[in-house]
Amino acid sequence: MAKFAVIGGYTAEAWSKMIDNPGDRVAAVQKVAHAAGGKLEQFFWSFGDDDYLAIIDAPDDISAAAVSIAVGSSGSLRNLRTIRLITPEEGRQVLEKAKAAKAAYSPPGAKAAAGVR
């Protein structure tokens, strides 16, 4: 499974409702992640620009996007972002592919690389 960071904030209305009835936000995130075929690995409250950070394991990008859209459609969140996390091993593989891609790339206005149109 792939890991995703789900980051964002609550609206003023959502904060007001949670103050009146705190509930269990971790259980709510666990439930939505499970419904999309994933699982919640970690959940943190934060302060500053964002109010929470959830680390979710999901089988694929589509499942992670489904979680993000499901919670985003509630109207209780602001500045919701879902970020695909890359392990150090995956990062090494990305850099290896980037090396080959860089050799084939021609920036705008530059002469195209040999054999590439």
Question: What does each model-identified segment do?
Answer:
Residues 1-117:
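A compositional/biophysical signature of low hydrophobicity enriched in polar/charged and small residues
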